């Protein structure tokens, strides 16, 4: 059909306006496009093109029979031109009013027995009503004018967005200029007023999108809302931008929730079981200097709580309420600065930046790279710049060691995180560190939990008890009398680098935690190491294997979480599928029930 129409256009030498009218009123089984009708309406403002358009329309309206689509599409195009075209179109239509009156009796039944003339009769009645009712015609033309302005604005807006994206790709460093930013700033109040008049806007949109059928009883926009809508509601893109620019309601500040220790430890145990390895983190690589700087920044995987109370323990810890949960004692030297505290020459903890986030979990504690410094003593290696020749005696000055407690706010059983392994800054030599750790390990009533076998200790959380199989250090009661004797004279305790002292040092494996007790030492350090040796004694191959194993654990954990997410998505899709199936069944039943009365009415009419 299209090829035949093109040949006919070429043979009869039709003008551009006539070709467009013929295409809009063709015999194709679809309606004319809005862009084509818009072009034809623009041509009506030209006198020559207007006469050509109207002559072709009247010629198409005189068709009958199988060319009933010519008539219907001509009425549709005429209705569009009356609303959007020149006012001279209205004069031409009123001059041929009698031709429109004859179309009210148009009859045509196709081969399938369907009355196709019904739509032509109804459309002709609408056009005649529009031509006779002057106020209705004015309102329809105003609505069409606003629609046209909004459409043109949306086209310009899309072109501006395209130009800005092209400039962004051309120069990525230059910021993209937002042309309509000032307009959005001043149009927001007007958009708020339009939002209050929701019903009026809905009525206008209904008329703009359904231009083929316009009933006189439809709700029309008042003259007062015309400038508001022209300036405040230019396109749907502006509406979307306004919604994006609206300030969000402030969320209620909720205190950080403390994760239950049993739940956290159970999750960590599952991760350990999946990976088939220990939960104790290992160092990924050895740096050339052997130094590690740990800075507890404000990250999403922060572990330590910022509710640390630096108060001396004046009463035994057994008398405290069970609702406060378990607390971990961490020994902090009194000579630390306000901003940064040096736990050892290699370990630096920023006190001002350490925070607690409710997103933290024991899994991140076990597998986070920032805590790999606490795995083994061999990795907490003093830099060569701090190393000093071995001395015959090492004496530690009197330093008051303050104890701090991390208080958990959860009403249930609260959990304490892994304490830091700390030593004095004076312990500069790796050879002396082994001798200095043996008296420090022996703390009064301090004990640490076993890493793999911890069946004797349990947390009481209402009626539930769970055994902990992880390397989290706990603490025992500390008396106030012991705190008075904080000074430590290592000269009287340790011999001068003798072989007997080296033999007496207990080598604690990385999979067990020891239990120590002495009389007058107010300090403990949980250790998980295979031996007190320098980094030169340890090969680097096992550490590389450990780093690979840690990465494999993280990959396995990510895959497991992805599998869980996919399973939930599949379940939701199944639910949606079931709902859609039920809706389709209901619609089919309704259609069948509606067909039954129609068939009964048809039989009664035949009777």
From Swiss-Prot:
Residues 9-141 form the ENTH domain. The keyword Transcription regulation does not apply. PROSITE patterns: ENTH (PS50942). Transmembrane segments: none annotated. Gene3D superfamilies: 1.25.40.90. SMART domains: ENTH. GO terms for molecular function: clathrin binding; phospholipid binding. Keywords: Coiled coil. PANTHER family: ENTH DOMAIN-CONTAINING PROTEIN 1, EPSIN/ENT-RELATED. This is ENTH domain-containing protein 1. The lineage of its organism: Eukaryota, Metazoa, Chordata, Craniata, Vertebrata.
């Amino acid at each position: 059909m299209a090829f035949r129409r093109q040949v006919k256009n070429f043979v009869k030498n039709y003008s551009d306006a006539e070709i467009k009218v013929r295409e809009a009123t063709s015999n194709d089984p679809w309606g004319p496009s809005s862009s084509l009708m818009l072009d034809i309406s623009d041509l009506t403002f030209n006198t020559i093109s207007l006469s050509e358009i109207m002559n072709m329309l009247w010629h198409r309206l005189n068709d009958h029979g199988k060319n009933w689509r010519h008539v219907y599409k001509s009425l549709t195009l005429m209705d569009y031109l009356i609303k959007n075209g020149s006012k001279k179109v209205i004069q031409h239509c009123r001059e041929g009013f009698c031709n429109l009156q004859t179309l009210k009796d148009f009859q045509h039944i196709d081969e399938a027995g369907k009355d196709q003339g019904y739509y032509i009769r109804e459309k002709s009645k609408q056009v005649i009503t529009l031509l006779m009712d002057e106020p209705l015609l004015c309102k329809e033309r105003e609505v069409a004018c606003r629609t046209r302005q909004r459409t043109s604005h949306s086209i310009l807006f899309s072109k501006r967005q395209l130009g800005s994206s092209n400039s962004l790709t051309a120069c990525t460093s230059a910021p993209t200029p937002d042309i309509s930013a000032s307009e959005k700033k001043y149009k927001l109040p007007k958009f708020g007023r339009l939002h209050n008049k929701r019903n009026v806007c809905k009525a206008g949109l209904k008329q703009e999108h359904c231009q083929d059928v316009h009933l006189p009883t439809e709700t029309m926009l008042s003259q007062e809302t015309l400038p508001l809508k022209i300036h405040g509601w230019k396109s749907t893109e502006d509406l979307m931008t306004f919604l994006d620019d609206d300030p969000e309601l402030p969320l209620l500040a909720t205190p950080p929730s403390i994760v239950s220790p049993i739940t956290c430890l159970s999750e960590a145990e599952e991760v350990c079981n999946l990976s088939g390895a220990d939960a104790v983190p290992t160092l990924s690589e050895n740096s050339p200097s052997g130094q590690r700087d740990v800075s507890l920044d404000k990250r999403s995987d922060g572990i330590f709580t910022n509710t640390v109370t630096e108060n001396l323990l004046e009463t035994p810890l057994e008398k405290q309420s069970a609702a406060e949960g378990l607390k971990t004692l961490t020994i902090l030297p009194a000579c630390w600065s306000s901003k940064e505290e040096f736990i050892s020459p290699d370990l630096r903890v920023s006190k001002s930046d350490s925070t607690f986030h409710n997103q933290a979990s024991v899994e991140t504690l076990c597998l986070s790279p920032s805590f790999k410094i606490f795995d083994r003593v061999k990795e907490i290696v003093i830099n060569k710049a701090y190393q000093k020749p071995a001395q015959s005696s090492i004496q530690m000055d009197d330093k008051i060691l303050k104890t701090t407690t991390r208080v958990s706010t959860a009403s249930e059983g609260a959990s304490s995180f892994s304490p830091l392994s700390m030593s004095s800054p004076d312990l500069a030599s790796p050879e002396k560190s082994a001798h200095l750790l043996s008296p420090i390990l022996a703390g009064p009533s301090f004990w640490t939990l076993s890493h793999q076998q911890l069946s004797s200790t349990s947390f009481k959380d209402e009626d539930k008890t769970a055994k902990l199989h992880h390397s989290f250090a706990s603490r025992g009661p500390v008396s106030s009398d012991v705190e008075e004797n904080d000074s430590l004279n290592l000269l009287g305790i340790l011999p001068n680098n003798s072989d007997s002292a080296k033999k007496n040092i207990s080598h604690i494996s990385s999979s067990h935690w020891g239990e120590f007790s002495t009389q007058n030492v107010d300090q403990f350090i949980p250790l998980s190491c295979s031996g007190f040796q320098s980094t030169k004694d340890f090969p680097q191959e096992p550490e590389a294997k450990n780093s690979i194993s840690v990465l494999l654990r993280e990959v396995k954990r990510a895959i497991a979480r992805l599998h869980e997410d996919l399973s939930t998505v599949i379940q939701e899709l199944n639910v949606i599928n079931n709902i859609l199936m039920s809706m389709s069944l209901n619609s089919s039943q309704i259609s069948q029930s509606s067909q039954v009365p129609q068939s009964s009415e048809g039989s009664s009419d035949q009777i």
